Curated annotation (Swiss-Prot):
It comes from Rhizobium leguminosarum bv. trifolii (strain WSM2304). The gene is hslV. It is an enzyme of class 3 (hydrolase). Its EC number is 3.4.25.2. This is ATP-dependent protease subunit HslV. CDD domains: protease_HslV. Belongs to the peptidase T1B family. HslV subfamily. The active site is at T2. A double ring-shaped homohexamer of HslV is capped on each side by a ring-shaped HslU homohexamer. The assembly of the HslU/HslV complex is dependent on binding of ATP. It catalyses: ATP-dependent cleavage of peptide bonds with broad specificity. Its main location: cytoplasm. It is found in: Cytoplasm.
Amino acid sequence: MTTIITVRKGGKVVMAGDGQVSLGQTVMKGNARKVRRIGKGEVIAGFAGATADAFTLLERLEKKLEQYPGQLMRAAVELAKDWRTDKYLRNLEAMMLVADKSITLAITGNGDVLEPEHGTTAIGSGGNFAFAAARALMDTDKSAEEIARRALEIAADICVYTNHNIVVESLDVEG
């Protein structure tokens, strides 16, 4: 699996993810890019789970963003509706974090669209470790990027399905 984290602090929203792709007990690739910009560069998306499934969902989200430009929440809800009701999509095994300048959302395969509190959230095999680390660092003077990187490093030290090859994307937030 993998670990993806997002941190919103100090005028920035940062998303970071590791690069490990595992097949069972084997590391197949160490430098996959699971965090990327979509929606004309206005949205950051990160995924955990089956890679092909995640790409399918990213493509669907991009289409929803074209349909509802500048409305990340609406696009995410419409994607979640499709994900939950479509016979093919319902079987996809992936989760996504998405963020734009004003909102961060976690989109699950159950059709949930969740807006995290406390300025941070994480998904994937090391998500709970990264989330706990980020929560502990939110009250420090560290920047959003420093928190995201350190939280992922801690998760990678603990979770065998997360590595230290970290990719970071960031956006300036409204404020």
